[in-house]
Regions:
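Class I S-adenosyl-L-methionine
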Residues: 1-240
Length: 240
């Protein structure tokens, strides 16, 4: 997907997309269709559209099916794009301690364009600790600030759920840099430690980035437990 990188329409802008921007998305691609719906809703910062799309399509290349759980979801576009990209997921939960009122506006606009979303999007305005995860979930979170990313990782690990996070706002006074500050800048060291800890626990880790012209906080950490081989048949079955 080509990015608009000119000064007038930078993908990193926090300006809201509105109907004035509809002409910038004329194609019949899924991204342009989503963008036109977002423009019509008139409530989403431009950078969130590009961030959600770039993260969702990378995660869906790795993880199919399962309930999608978008934690610290904000407007919830990430989770809903993931549902559009893979209709085998039964539903998406959008969870945030403080959901913006316009998250409902955006969800209704998306469901009007894609009726199959209707009834499959659940909002949970609750603290992160109160959200229950399941083993078959795909847990995603974009820019959960500081140690919130660590709490998202911890919850996914506890549930053995598939995980994708794109951290931001690293708190170097609290987060573990693994004594790597002499070689790496602080935020990168924190993310290296996060990935290394998951690997040490036996998780398969994939590290990627989205285009930096969208956000400087562009490191994407994707992880899952290896698939366990099927248990051998019972001794009785083997004797047969």
């Amino acid at each position: 997907m080509p990015l608009h990188t000119d000064d007038v329409f930078a993908p990193s802008s926090k300006a809201r997309l509105t109907t004035r921007d509809l002409g910038r998305f004329p194609e019949d691609t899924l991204f342009h269709r989503i963008a036109r719906v977002v423009c019509g809703a008139g409530c989403l910062p431009r950078k969130e559209l590009f961030e959600a799309w770039e993260v969702a399509r990378r995660v869906r290349r790795r993880f199919r099916g399962g309930r999608v759980v978008d934690l610290c979801a904000g407007h919830g576009l990430l989770g809903q794009i993931m549902l559009l990209l893979d209709d085998s997921s039964p539903e998406v939960m959008l969870a945030d301690p403080s959901l913006p009122p316009s998250s409902v506006t955006l969800s209704r606009a998306l469901a009007a364009e894609w009726p199959r979303l209707d009834g499959r999007v659940t909002f949970r305005e609750e603290p992160l600790d109160q959200i229950e995860l399941r083993k078959d979930d795909v847990v995603a979170s974009v820019h959960a600030c500081g140690t919130l990313t660590d709490r998202v990782i911890e919850k996914a690990v506890a549930a053995r759920a598939r995980l994708a996070v794109m951290p931001c706002c690293h708190n170097l006074d609290v987060s573990d840099t693994g004594a790597l500050g002499g070689w790496l800048d602080g935020p990168l060291a924190v993310d290296v430690v996060r990935a290394s800890r998951l690997r040490a626990m036996g998780w398969q880790v994939v590290t990627q980035t989205i285009p930096r012209e969208i956000t400087p906080h562009n490191r994407l950490l994707i992880a899952e437990l290896p698939r366990v081989a099927e248990e051998p048949s019972s001794p009785t079955a083997r004797r047969r």
